[in-house]
């Protein structure tokens, strides 16, 4: 039976989504792993999104809280809002009370990735504050650490991400994820999928 890894994200302008796509590719590259992209529901009205010049949403399906229980592992992604995850993703997690009550996600591995507007915009604080959500569900936080190797020490060019997970900087919105950031995202997907597969195999 395939190991299921769900990449669940919220993306307003597409930066997080691009990382999510690479993470899915990385996870799917692990033999025996089925990787699937999911979006969390939008909480803003179309009128508000239009005023914010947000592009149309992608075709990735909208996930419901109960569908989380189907997966063996996760990678959660979101843009940063004042050093924390975006409210849309927090609203989705707030709706997982039934799963929490049953501890349906306990023992399942999960990683985190993110996008911020600037280098001091809260990439690590976003990950740190998001970990509390995993803890209450009994999930296992899987950081990438320095497993990405030399790419973690890039100093010549601006690069998002950290030992906590893959990341990118959006700037004024015109900056897109770099090739190195996308490579780090692919690595994160591959890394977490491998760990998820091992954990599932040890409990089979």
UniProtKB/Swiss-Prot annotation:
Free-text function comment from the UniProt entry: Catalyzes the transfer of electrons from NADH and NADPH to several quinones in vitro. May act as detoxification enzyme, and protect against auxin-induced oxidative stress.
EC number, UniProt record: 1.6.5.2
KO phenotype (gene knockout): No visible phenotype under normal growth conditions, but mutant plants have increased resistance to the necrotrophic fungus Botrytis cinerea.
GO molecular function terms attached to this record: FMN binding; NAD(P)H dehydrogenase (quinone) activity; NADH:ubiquinone reductase (non-electrogenic) activity; NADPH dehydrogenase (quinone) activity
Listed Gene3D superfamilies: 3.40.50.360
Catalytic activity, as annotated: a quinone + NADH + H(+) = a quinol + NAD(+); a quinone + NADPH + H(+) = a quinol + NADP(+)
One matching Pfam family: FMN_red
Record carries keyword Lipoprotein: no
Listed name of the protein: NAD(P)H dehydrogenase (quinone) FQR1
PROSITE patterns associated with the record: FLAVODOXIN_LIKE
Keyword Cell membrane: yes
Family in the record: Belongs to the WrbA family.
Gene: FQR1
Major place of residence: membrane
Stretches that traverse the bilayer: none
BP-aspect Gene Ontology terms: cellular response to auxin stimulus; response to oxidative stress
Keywords, sorted A to Z: Cell membrane, Flavoprotein, FMN, Membrane, NAD, NADP, Nucleotide-binding, Oxidoreductase, Stress response
């Amino acid at each position: 039976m395939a190991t299921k890894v769900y990449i669940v994200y919220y993306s307003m302008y597409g930066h997080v989504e691009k990382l999510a796509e690479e993470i899915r590719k990385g996870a799917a590259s692990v033999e025996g792993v089925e990787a699937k992209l999911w979006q969390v529901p939008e909480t803003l009205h179309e009128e508000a999104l239009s005023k914010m010049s947000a592009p149309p949403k992608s075709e990735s399906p909208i996930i419901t809280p109960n569908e989380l229980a189907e997966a063996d592992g996760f990678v959660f992604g979101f843009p940063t809002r004042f050093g924390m995850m975006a409210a849309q993703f927090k609203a989705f997690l707030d709706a997982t009370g039934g799963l929490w009550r049953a501890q349906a996600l306990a023992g399942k591995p999960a990683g985190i990735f993110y996008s911020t507007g600037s280098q001091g915009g809260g990439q690590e604080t976003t990950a740190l504050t998001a970990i509390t959500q995993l803890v209450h569900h009994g999930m296992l936080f899987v950081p990438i650490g320095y497993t990405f190797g030399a790419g973690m020490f890039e100093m010549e060019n601006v690069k998002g991400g950290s030992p906590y997970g893959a990341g990118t900087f959006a700037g004024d919105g015109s900056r897109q994820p770099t090739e190195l950031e996308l490579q780090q995202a692919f690595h994160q997907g591959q890394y977490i999928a491998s760990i998820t597969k091992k954990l599932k195999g040890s409990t089979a």
